[in-house]
């Protein structure tokens, strides 16, 4: 029986997942269009606080948090209050879960 090393298949499987994740990420133009379409831009900007926090500040606060994507996606969908002050963020039930996840993933890539 011929034995083959297992590491190449593990490496290429991992590379496939990374490539798919990179493919799913929004580019800046698509993300900004989604911000406008979904109404996020009424309260948020990339680099300055409007009513809600700047997206760069959100990315900095949650940097390194492995649960940030899931937790923030949930807050965007259901709304929240108290994390960035007492002005509530309304729920965004009209935005699809996939769009929310893509937008939050993009936000988490931003740097100051």
Predicted features, each with a name:
Residues 26-46:
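Sequence/structural segment immediately N-terminal to covalent heme-attachment motifs in c-type
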Residues 105-111:
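Short, low-complexity, Pro/Ser/Thr/Gly-rich segments in the mature regions of secreted, periplasmic
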Residues 61-71:
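Short microdomains enriched in Cys/His and/or Lys/Arg
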Residues 1-29, 111-112:
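N-terminal export/targeting leaders of redox proteins
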Residues 42, 48-62, 75-104:
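Axial heme c-ligation environment in periplasmic c-type cytochrome domains
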């Amino acid at each position: 029986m011929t034995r083959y090393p297992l590491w190449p298949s593990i490496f290429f499987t991992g590379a496939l997942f990374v490539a798919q994740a990179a493919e799913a990420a929004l580019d800046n133009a698509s993300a900004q269009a989604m911000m406008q379409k979904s109404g996020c831009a009424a309260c948020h900007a990339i680099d300055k606080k409007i009513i809600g926090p700047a997206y760069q500040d959100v990315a900095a606060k949650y940097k390194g948090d492995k649960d940030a994507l899931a937790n923030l996606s949930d807050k965007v969908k259901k709304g929240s209050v108290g994390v960035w002050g007492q002005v509530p963020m309304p729920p965004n039930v009209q935005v699809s879960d996939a769009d929310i996840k893509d937008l939050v993933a993009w936000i988490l890539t931003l740097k100051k």
